């Protein structure tokens, strides 16, 4: 359905390099596991040629290498097989949403939590791409589930499973490290505060018992997690392999002066409330109501304090970490929080016992399905009714919230029907992608020296990302004619990522 999206051209080729070289040196600023998994089908069956001594690999020039590698091979086939891997991870995540909600609140709640989860547009949209955020979300949730089980039953098999998926979460994205402090916190709650005998520690022997129990619960999980992570990194001799990657996260390809866009304004460094607002306007309103409803019933749920902590503290910490450390480039960073919230939202079904509440729930559910389905196939660009729907999304956010350069296939259909149309395409997929999809790089006028934007003539298909960024360029260069969003009304759109203008 979609052409190669922005980050796919680095995640997938990097995965091929890792599988070929059996080491994680190329693009070590990103955890490798999702890229490796996505590349595995192509590596085994397509077998594209790859020279591990390629100059771009040696110099860690992952953007240029990824672009050249994909578009000189069968990019569509390689990306399709990689996307199928991520889709499977998304389905697996949905299974555990149902499983956990069922064990906590009953089978009906499990089914309702599953229903809530599978219609979240941001999750669905990124599950169609090679997304490290979806991979992290799946492993984060499953590891948390098994760690919760291990605290409930203290069985070795649950500790091992929690550790396995913890290692995978760490290997999927560096923000997987959040599992460590969360698991320590939950273990502390389980050991010290879960029974009356743990509230009044009078003797050092009792303290010692609790410490032994504490470490007995967490150390096996952490040990297995490290072994899995070490395996993902192909058993490096230097055990600082992961911390080296963590340190390099902000060292590569990050421009601190890049102006972040929100609500029509630009600001270097972004806003602390970027992700909170993004969550509110890019999540269907019925989902938000389900969640508030569940929170209003917080004291009525027949589950333990520890159960509630797993479902509420985990997404809260993810929100906080994302808000104060992640670049303001997309609500996709919040995807790992959604399954926990869907599970908790599912709990409301166990409190539905009046006709009025049944009618209200059904009405919300119909609205929810309509809102989500109506955005197909552009779930990635979904915005809710608070801002007037997806058509107005560009007024509030850009980048991976709307346009990631993923609509070249639909652009090809448009240019076939309108052969004289000019294209303005700014993503790093660039000329090779335009040629690969049969559009032709010569149609892209972005680099023409003449001021084509000042006196436009004919038909233009313009990337919405460019249109948003042109607003700040028009201010910086005192060039009002660049600001097409203010000057002209588009005749049509291709999804939400290309605006069609006729002059």
Please report, for each region that a protein language model flagged, where it lies by residue.
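Interfacial juxtamembrane loops and adjacent helix segments
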Residues: 24-85, 239-268
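Membrane-interface transmembrane helices that cradle and orient dolichyl/undecaprenyl
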Residues: 143-158
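Membrane-interface helix-loop-helix junctions at transmembrane boundaries of multi-pass membrane enzymes
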Residues: 103, 196-216, 293-313, 355-358
């Amino acid at each position: 359905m979609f052409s190669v999206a922005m980050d796919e051209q680095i995640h997938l080729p990097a995965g091929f390099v890792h599988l070929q070289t059996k080491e994680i040196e190329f693009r070590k600023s990103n955890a490798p596991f999702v890229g490796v998994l996505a590349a595995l089908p192509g590596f085994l069956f397509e077998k594209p040629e790859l020279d591990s001594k390629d100059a771009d690999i040696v110099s860690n020039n992952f953007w240029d290498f990824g672009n050249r590698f994909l578009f000189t091979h069968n990019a569509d086939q390689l990306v399709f097989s990689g996307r199928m891997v991520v889709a499977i991870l998304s389905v697996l995540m949905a299974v555990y949403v149902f499983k956990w909600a069922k064990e906590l609140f009953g089978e009906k709640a499990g089914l309702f939590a599953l229903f809530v989860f599978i219609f979240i547009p941001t999750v669905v949209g990124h599950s169609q791409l090679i997304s490290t955020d979806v991979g992290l979300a799946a492993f984060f949730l499953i590891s948390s589930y098994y760690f919760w089980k291990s605290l409930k039953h203290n069985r070795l098999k649950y500790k091992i499973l929690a550790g396995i998926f913890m290692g995978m979460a760490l290997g999927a994205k560096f923000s997987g490290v959040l599992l460590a402090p969360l698991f320590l916190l939950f273990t502390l709650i389980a050991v010290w505060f879960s029974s009356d005998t743990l509230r009044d520690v009078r003797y050092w022997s009792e303290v010692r018992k609790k410490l032994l129990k504490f470490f007995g619960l967490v150390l096996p999980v952490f040990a297995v997690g490290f072994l899995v992570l070490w395996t993902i990194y192909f058993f490096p001799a230097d055990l600082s392999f992961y911390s080296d990657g963590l340190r390099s996260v902000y060292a590569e390809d990050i421009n601190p002066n890049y102006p972040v866009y929100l609500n029509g304004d630009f600001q270097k460094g972004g806003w602390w409330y970027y992700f909170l607002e993004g969550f509110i306007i890019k999540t269907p309103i019925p989902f938000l109501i389900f969640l508030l409803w569940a929170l209003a019933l917080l004291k009525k749920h027949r589950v333990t304090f520890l159960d509630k902590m797993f479902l509420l503290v985990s997404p809260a910490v993810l929100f906080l970490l994302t808000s104060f450390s992640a670049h303001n480039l997309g609500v996709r960073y919040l995807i790992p929080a959604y399954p926990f919230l869907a599970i908790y939202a599912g709990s409301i079904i166990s409190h539905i016992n009046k006709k009025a509440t049944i009618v209200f729930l059904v009405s919300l559910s119909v609205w929810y399905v309509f809102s989500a389905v109506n955005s197909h196939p552009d779930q990635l660009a979904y915005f809710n009714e608070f801002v007037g729907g997806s058509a107005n999304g560009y007024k509030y956010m850009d980048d991976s919230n709307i346009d990631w350069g993923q609509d070249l296939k639909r652009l090809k259909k448009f240019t076939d029907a309108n052969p004289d149309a000019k294209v303005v395409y700014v993503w790093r997929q660039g000329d090779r992608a335009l040629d690969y999809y049969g559009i032709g790089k010569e149609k892209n006028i972005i680099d023409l020296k003449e001021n084509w934007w000042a006196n436009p003539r004919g038909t233009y298909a313009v990337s919405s990302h460019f249109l948003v960024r042109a607003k700040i360029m028009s201010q910086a260069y005192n060039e009002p004619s660049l600001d097409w969003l203010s000057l002209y009304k588009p005749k049509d759109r291709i999804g939400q990522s290309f605006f069609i203008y006729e002059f």
